[in-house]
From Swiss-Prot:
Disulfide bonds: none annotated. The lineage of its organism: Archaea, Thermoproteota, Thermoprotei, Thermoproteales, Thermoproteaceae. Belongs to the universal ribosomal protein uS5 family. The N-terminal domain interacts with the head of the 30S subunit; the C-terminal domain interacts with the body and contacts protein S4. The interaction surface between S4 and S5 is involved in control of translational fidelity. This is Small ribosomal subunit protein uS5. One of its GO terms (molecular function) is structural constituent of ribosome. Residues 50-113 form the S5 DRBM domain. InterPro entries: Ribosomal_Su5_D2-typ_SF, Ribosomal_uS5, Ribosomal_uS5_arc, Ribosomal_uS5_C, Ribosomal_uS5_euk/arc, Ribosomal_uS5_N, Ribosomal_uS5_N_CS, Ribsml_uS5_D2-typ_fold_subgr. It comes from Pyrobaculum islandicum (strain DSM 4184 / JCM 9189 / GEO3). One of its GO terms (biological process) is translation. PANTHER family: 40S RIBOSOMAL PROTEIN S2 (PTHR13718:SF4), RIBOSOMAL S SUBUNIT (PTHR13718). Part of the 30S ribosomal subunit. Contacts protein S4. It comes from the Archaea. GO terms for cellular component: cytosolic small ribosomal subunit. With S4 and S12 plays an important role in translational accuracy.
């Protein structure tokens, strides 16, 4: 992966300038003020320890005037394992470029995740699960996240486990509907469910 020299970064947005000037110091401030992240460097500065995992690499055909062209399609999840997660997709002729595009999009899609101890079987009050039952949908796939007591672990498919772990969720039950073999829709449905923990009005 290419490394960006943040000292050379010239912000193109007002939010970017505020971050580079040190007027916004935490990622929490961004979401508390309803800012929209349009530059991945903002995430690089405020969440330098962000982890990333490739969920899927596919070869896809693209029709052009010169005929069919092959491209790599990559799905990536990013997260700090402590309440922030993002999912992105990238397409390019080279795998490396597709990964970089996917990581960039995942950073721009970063969302806060509200965690809690929502299971009636557990009363530890620690942020190890989701605080309430929440759903997310993408394409034909619908995912329901159900609070689980401490020690249950992530009762979910492999793709969902990665996204949940990167978000900092340690215990949860899941229910799924639709074609979960479609990695992008499965990952995005989980992402949307996690996003809904933050934006859901209690």
């Amino acid at each position: 992966m290419s490394v960006v020299d943040l000292s050379l970064w010239e912000p193109r947005t007002e939010l970017g300038r505020l971050v580079k000037e040190g007027k916004i110091r935490t990622i929490d401030e961004i979401f508390a003020n309803n800012y929209i992240i349009k530059e991945p460097e903002i995430v690089d500065i405020l969440l330098p320890g962000l982890k990333q995992e490739i969920l899927n690499i596919n070869v896809v055909q693209r029709q052009t005037h010169a005929g069919e062209r092959s491209q790599f399609q990559v799905v990536v999840a990013v997260g700090n394992e402590d309440g922030y997660v993002g999912v992105g997709i990238g397409k390019a002729k080279q795998v490396r470029q597709a990964i970089e595009k996917a990581v960039r999009e995942a950073k721009l899609n970063l969302t806060p995740v509200r965690r809690g101890c929502g299971s009636w079987k557990c009363s530890c009050d620690e942020p190890h699960s989701v605080p309430f039952v929440v759903r997310g949908k993408s394409g034909s796939v619908e995912v329901t996240l159900i609070p689980a007591p401490k020690g249950v672990g992530l009762v979910a498919g492999d793709v969902a486990k990665v996204v949940l772990r990167l978000a900092g969720i340690k215990d949860v039950w899941t229910q799924t509907r639709g074609d979960t073999r479609t990695t992008l829709n499965f990952a995005m449905a989980v992402y949307n469910a996690l996003r809904n923990t933050y934006y859901f009005k209690i």
